Regions:
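Conserved alpha-helix/loop element of class I SAM-dependent methyltransferases that forms part
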Residues: 26-49
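Conserved SAM-binding loop of SAM-dependent methyltransferases across substrates and taxa
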Residues: 59-71
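Conserved SAM/SAH-binding beta-strand->alpha-helix loop
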Residues: 80
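A short acidic, Gly/Pro-enriched loop at the edge of an enzyme's catalytic core
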Residues: 112-122
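A short SAM/SAH-binding and catalytic strip from SAM-dependent methyltransferases
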Residues: 120-133
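A short glycine-rich, Lys/Arg-flanked "PGG" loop and its adjoining helix->strand segment in the class I
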Residues: 135-147
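Conserved class I S-adenosyl-L-methionine
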Residues: 150-188
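Rossmann-like AdoMet/SAM-dependent catalytic core
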Residues: 204-345
């Protein structure tokens, strides 16, 4: 869908970089990031001594882990002036606590950047979405990776975005029309703090979560699905690892050559049969029919698109059309497992 603004325009308009993480317990933060990277197949030793590019690091909190792995070169491509200041302050403070490689901040947009030398590892987390421009940028991003290098990006399903889509729609009844960003954030923090505090391991600051998830127009670009990613970057890449781990490949390893490899096809088949599990991490259900899952995902996309269109048009009334779209998704979820009938029914 077409949004009035993207992430960057919104950030620049308000001079914000609302992606800060709580790193007061730095050891815990680094362990969390290390667990993620190890799970996707990139342990610390695979980063050490490598040339790394990270696109859209925001305030830089997540970059601390990569820096602590001592890459040979660490470039941060970030066009947001507010983020530059926060990155510099973050590294100034934390380099006193642990050994860090000082990153090079490249103060450009991805659209204006060209890499004269390719990187071993390219990272772009939770930024590029599904609109035409951002899918083209994904293609550009992939060209910065050396042959047999690693590209780390955020992929996902609209099903995984559903809880935040519902929270976003509910926020329409909380904030007043034409309120300032500051007033809207204060109202949302007041409304959602008790709820957010039930998420034990949430690390994003509540203020930034409200600015980014409940108010930022870039929310509606979502993340590309794995199928979109493969379509955009072609067969130059295969999905090497993911978190959560999606596929279990029981084929005989000696058969994995030439046209038999089909790593992406095996991953996509497993992914489509498991996307219902993105809705609620409290339940891990058995794989189910791919077509039923894709129908559920389409309903989730429909709801997200409707909410985004309403906001673009200035119509944030939770009326029959919105409720009907929500119920269409809920009905499909309740069919999957009766556990969801109580909170969703």
């Amino acid at each position: 869908m077409k949004n009035k603004f993207d992430h960057l325009e919104y950030y620049l308009e308000h001079s914000i970089s609302p992606v800060r993480q709580d790193v007061e317990n730095l050891k815990q933060h680094l362990e969390r990031r290390g667990a993620l990277y190890t799970s996707i197949g990139l342990p610390e030793l695979m980063i050490k001594g490598k040339k790394v590019l990270e696109v859209g690091p925001g305030s830089g909190h997540n970059s601390l882990y990569v820096s602590s792995c001592i890459p040979q070169l660490y470039d941060l491509l970030e066009p947001n002036k507010s983020a530059w200041i926060e990155i510099e302050e973050l590294y100034s403070e934390n380099s006193k606590k642990i050994k860090l490689v000082q990153p090079n901040i490249i103060k450009k947009k991805l659209e204006d950047f060209d890499a004269y030398e390719k990187y071993d590892i390219v990272i772009c987390e939770a930024w590029l979405g599904i609109n035409k421009n951002e899918r083209e940028l994904m293609q550009k991003l992939s060209k910065f990776v050396k042959p047999k290098g690693i590209l780390i990006v955020t992929l996902g399903s609209a099903i995984g975005h559903l809880p935040n889509t519902i929270r976003r729609i509910l926020s329409w009844n909380i904030i007043k029309p034409n309120s300032s960003l500051k007033d809207s954030v204060n109202e949302l923090i007041h409304a959602y703090t008790s709820h957010l505090e039930t998420m034990k391991d949430m690390s994003k600051l509540h203020e930034d979560w409200c600015k980014d998830i409940l108010l930022g127009p870039g929310f509606y670009t979502l993340s590309p699905t794995p199928d979109m990613f493969i379509e955009d970057v072609g067969e130059k890449f295969f999905i090497y690892g993911s978190y959560p781990k999606i596929s279990m490949d029981w084929r005989w390893y000696k058969s994995l050559y030439g046209s038999n490899r089909k790593f992406n096809e095996v991953f996509l088949e497993a992914y489509d049969r498991n996307i219902h599990n993105f809705f609620d991490y409290n339940l891990v259900l058995e794989p189910r029919n791919k077509e039923l899952n894709l129908a559920l995902e389409n309903c989730a996309f429909d709801l997200t698109n409707l909410a985004g269109q309403r906001e673009n048009n200035g119509n944030t009334v939770i009326d029959y059309e919105v409720i009907h779209s929500i119920n269409a998704v809920f009905d499909k979820l309740i069919e999957i497992h009766p556990y969801w009938s109580k909170p969703l029914g």
